[in-house]
């Protein structure tokens, strides 16, 4: 029987050499998850933890038509300061390290995606048990579908905005959407928060800035780091895309248009040196990583990128809103 992982904090703030060991770690992680499921009652998990573990063990894989790069492995790396990329080729996941434990932002689309993230965390030399808090950009399956698995495997607390709490716990997107409810594995929320919530862990502070629209509780996270003596502001923007949302006559999210408009203005006003989005293509992360590997110390630094991201998102939103209004001229916003 595989023993539970060590609770010893790993040494943060350096990039250990990545090897093929992350691939070999997959089977041991799966065994560890089964060990925790079988022994949840022994370590304080209780009936709920055991039930969730059982569901995860038997739940079929969903969204088989998702883009291949959403689950394609990529070597993890340090971005700036104490921030590490631990996601797949197409879907971001960010580890924010501290001397008192780490924060993980986003989870991938499924248990499989969560295990990919876990292997990347371990490949960087960190311990899964040192991940103390899980946070999320928004309650869509591609970013939240692996939260339950990560919570079971790390023992971390899950922090979710109040607007997305129900979606995370019920296991599906809330709001009228042309793509349907897009189910995901539900996860128990430990802390629901509002705007400007601060998450402090060691020397790291993250601030939640609610930017609803894409989902009701869409959350943009900000933090500050130091890179070789240079202070940098970092923003993890929540998506601003429409992504199938019904903008005209949305009964489940009646203020959706006003929410989008307020979020465009709010995000545009955030001072940002480094923008780290939830999808690779939203920030050309692969190209930036190649620049970094070639020795560019400012590969991820661009003080104008967030405003360009917002401008492009707002233009696309206005175009889609006009289309929906033309298609339903008698409907109310």
What residue spans do the PLM features occupy?
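Metallo-beta-lactamase
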Residues: 65, 72-73, 78-80, 115, ...
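Conserved beta-strand hairpin/beta-sheet module of binuclear metal-dependent hydrolase folds
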Residues: 69-124, 128, 221-242
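Active-site HxH/HxHxD metal-binding segment of metal-dependent hydrolases
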Residues: 112-115, 119-198, 294-295, 301, ...
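Glycine-biased, low-complexity coil/linker segments
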Residues: 20-21, 31-36, 42
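Active-site neighborhood of phospho(di)ester-bond hydrolases with catalytic His/Asp-centered motifs
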Residues: 105-108, 131-139, 159-161, 211-213, ...
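Active-site environment of divalent metal-dependent phosphoester hydrolases
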Residues: 112, 139-145, 165-168, 216-219, ...
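Bacterial N-terminal signal peptides
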Residues: 45-59
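Accessory terminal helices/loops
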Residues: 65-69, 228, 242-333
């Amino acid at each position: 029987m595989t023993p539970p992982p060590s609770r010893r904090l790993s040494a943060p703030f350096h990039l250990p050499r990545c090897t093929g060991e992350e691939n070999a770690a997959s089977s041991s992680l799966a065994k560890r998850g089964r060990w925790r499921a079988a022994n949840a009652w022994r370590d304080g998990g209780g009936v709920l933890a055991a039930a969730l573990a059982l569901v995860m063990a038997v739940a079929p894989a969903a969204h088989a038509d998702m883009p291949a790069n959403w689950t394609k492995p990529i070597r993890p790396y340090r971005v700036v300061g104490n921030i590490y990329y631990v996601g797949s080729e197409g879907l971001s996941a960010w580890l924010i390290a501290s001397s008192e434990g780490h924060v993980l932002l986003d989870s991938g689309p499924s248990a499989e995606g969560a295990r990919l993230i876990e292997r990347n965390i371990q490949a960087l030399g960190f311990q899964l048990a040192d991940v103390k808090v899980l946070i999320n950009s928004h309650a869509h399956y591609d970013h939240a579908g692996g939260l339950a698995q990560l919570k079971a495997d790390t023992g971390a607390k899950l922090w979710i905005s109040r607007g997305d709490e129900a979606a995370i716990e019920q296991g599906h997107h809330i709001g009228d959407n042309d793509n349907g409810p897009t189910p995901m594995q539900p996860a128990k929320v430990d802390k629901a928060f509002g705007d400007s919530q601060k998450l402090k862990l060691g020397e790291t502070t993250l601030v939640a800035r609610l930017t609803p629209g894409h989902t009701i509780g869409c959350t943009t996270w900000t933090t500050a780091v130091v890179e070789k003596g240079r202070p940098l502001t970092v923003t993890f923007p929540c998506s601003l895309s429409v992504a199938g949302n019904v903008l005209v006559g949305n009964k489940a999210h009646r203020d959706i248009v006003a929410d989008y408009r307020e979020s465009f203005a709010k995000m545009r006003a955030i001072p940002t040196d480094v923008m780290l989005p939830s999808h690779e293509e939203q920030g050309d992360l692969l190209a930036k990583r190649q620049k970094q590997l070639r020795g560019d110390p400012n590969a991820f630094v661009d003080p104008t990128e967030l405003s360009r991201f917002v401008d492009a998102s707002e233009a696309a939103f206005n175009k889609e809103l006009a289309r929906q209004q033309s298609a339903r001229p008698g409907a109310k916003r």
